[in-house]
């Protein structure tokens, strides 16, 4: 029996979903004011490359296999401020009803108004994610959340990467891969080229 099976059921897998530039930047792909940390001035850089036919289909396919979402605090707050106002759109309705987790030491339960959301404290991150990973289920999907993703990669708690590699170099910004002199091998499982030049790639942890 595969190590990814749990009493005959596939265990939950941790997948990272990112819009990413050629130089590895994931900061603020969706909006001008999404994240200006570090003086970042290219907010919304990914929007002109979005191909609904290819990229939209890939997002829909991944969401169908996703049982829960995990966010860092900043990304969760951006999402919580946007998606509830888009009720009626099928993807927005899915975002609003799916189970969500947010990693934060500052949010209180009263702040978690984008239901259903459960708060995970930073000190409990590895333990909580490992526990979720050991449950039967589909994907635990992490969108954006660069600092959180780096932490999970460094702890070897990532099973798959879903990357939309966009034909642009941004010259600076937040990245997701740890700078820790550790090699981590991934196997390419699928690749599709969008009409806008975006490479839609899926990788799974190798070895």
Name what the model sees in each region.
Residues 6-157, 167-207:
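Portal/gating segments that form or line small-molecule/metal binding sites
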Residues 160:
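Periplasmic plug
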């Amino acid at each position: 029996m595969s190590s990814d099976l749990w009493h005959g059921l596939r265990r939950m897998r941790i997948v990272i979903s990112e819009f990413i530039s050629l130089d590895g930047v994931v900061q603020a792909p969706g909006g001008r004011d999404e994240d200006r940390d570090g003086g970042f001035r290219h907010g919304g850089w990914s929007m002109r490359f979005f191909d609904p036919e290819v990229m939209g289909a890939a997002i829909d396919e991944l969401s169908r296999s996703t049982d829960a979402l995990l966010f860092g605090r900043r990304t969760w707050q951006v999402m919580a401020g946007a998606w509830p106002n888009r009720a009626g759109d099928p993807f927005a309705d899915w975002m609003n009803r799916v189970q969500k987790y947010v990693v934060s030491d500052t949010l209180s339960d009263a702040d978690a108004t984008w239901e259903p959301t459960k708060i995970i404290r930073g000190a409990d991150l590895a333990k909580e994610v490992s526990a979720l990973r050991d449950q039967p289920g589909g994907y635990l999907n992490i969108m954006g959340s660069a600092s959180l993703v780096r932490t999970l990669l460094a702890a070897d708690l990532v099973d798959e990467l879903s990357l939309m590699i966009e034909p642009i170099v941004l010259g600076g910004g937040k990245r997701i891969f740890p700078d820790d002199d550790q090699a981590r091998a991934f196997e390419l499982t699928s690749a599709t080229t969008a009409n806008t030049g975006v490479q839609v790639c899926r990788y799974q942890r190798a070895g």
